[in-house]
Amino acid sequence: MDPGQITFLADLVALRRDLHAHPELAFAETRTSDLVADELTRYGMQVHRGLARTGVIGVLRQGSSERAIGLRADMDALPLTEENTFAHRSRTPGLMHACGHDGHTAMLLGAARLLAEQRNEATFDGSVYFIFQPAEESEGGAQTMVAEGLFDRFPMDAVFGLHNWPGIPVGEMAVVAGPVMAGTCAFEIEVQGSGCHAAMPHQ
């Protein structure tokens, strides 16, 4: 990697670790949204705030096309106590980024920075909306953003999101035609034992 790529990667790692150390629950992602807005402003983007309380939208336009896409990441953490001992472990008792939303937020900031830095290199023609969504963890943050006018204010031809998946080898990705991980349901069980991610109880 060239020096610029090394610096870029180091900056993303630092962002992710900062976010991991400061988890916030659904609709209370105030520090996180401040950090996101500051970064997007630093990249030279228009920044819009207030959708779903703590949502942030970064706008990057280039060329004359009316085409537009959205890139989306979630920001909220979970009410869990982190037992890790590394330096960037959660500093908030009882809260933890246990589902990777710190990574999602850092990755989307990385994409925003990369496209902003290359905006004069004809990388795209149209608009890219960077959507930082609060309250993904069963709190309806996406639905709230839509109900409050996300697509009315920022019309898009398509929206793309992703989710980290540790079981996929580094450098590979899985793609599904249509919705994936788009459902939620609630139930209660009582388990005695070590905690885990509900999607991977066997691990």
Model region roles, listed by residue range:
Residues 2-97, 102, 106-125:
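Acidic/His- and Gly-rich active-site-bordering loop/insert found
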Residues 56-57, 78-80, 84-96, 102-103, ...:
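Histidine/acidic-residue-rich, glycine-tolerant segments that coordinate divalent metal ions
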